[in-house]
Amino acid sequence: RLRPGAAGRRDLAALAAFALVGVTLFYASLALAIDAGGISLAFVLLYTAPAFVALLAWPLLGERLDRRKLLLVAVAIAGVALVAQAGGGMRVGPAALAWGLASGASYASYYLFGKWVLHHYAPVTVFAIVLPIGAAGLAPLVRFAPSKPPEAWLWLVVLSVVSTYLAYLAYYTGLRRTEASRAVLVATVEPVAAALWAAAWFGERLGPLGWAGAA
């Protein structure tokens, strides 16, 4: 039965652990991967998440792993690689690879843990608990600049509410209705959408390989 209210003690511990993996480790490792290897490599490694989900959803969630699903995972990762390569600037090294794969594995936890938690709690309850705990875990890694102009604070609020909280609510609502391995494949449209927004807002352009990857 779905419980939209407060979490029990045992479940609260599980939610806190997920917060540290899915929020703290995810955002920290992605930032460190970008710093070590550049945005392009970081996002190629981030989107190894479909492979983690497809392989682990089989023993953990009982989802079928067949050739078609493995092929779709390979095609999705190849597409992300082509879109990212169009941006250039990859710097391959041990730290970049380690942090990038850590971001992919921690991102996969959203889907694997999500399928369990959505049987017990509404998405609103999940993220009301998970996001503050995960953000607190990131606090030691953040350098705060107290003197920000009002528009900067406005954009921080927009990013927090629209791009984070509401986005997570939307995709957990979708995750409830489909397999984890299928949902994570759909989510690989994110770098394509980012490339289109970059073209519209900042004048960045994809080359032929980038458009091939988007397709």
Question: How should each PLM-predicted stretch be described?
Answer:
Residues 7-13, 70, 85-106, 143-158, ...:
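Juxtamembrane helix-entry segments on the extracytoplasmic side of multipass membrane proteins
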Residues 1, 53-55, 59, 73, ...:
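Transmembrane alpha-helical segments that form core, pore/gating elements
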Residues 23, 41-48, 113-135, 164-200:
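Helix-helix packing/entry segments at the starts of transmembrane helices
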Residues 19-24, 28, 50-55, 81, ...:
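Hydrophobic/small/kink-forming positions within alpha-helical transmembrane segments
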Residues 33, 45, 59-65, 117, ...:
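Hydrophobic/aromatic residues within transmembrane alpha-helices
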Residues 25-35, 81-90, 134-148, 192-210:
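Hydrophobic alpha-helical transmembrane segments in multi-pass integral membrane proteins
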Residues 16, 56, 65-86, 131-138, ...:
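Hydrophobic transmembrane alpha-helices of multi-pass small-molecule transport proteins
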Residues 2-40, 46, 75, 82, ...:
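Specific transmembrane alpha-helical segments of multi-pass solute transporters/efflux pumps
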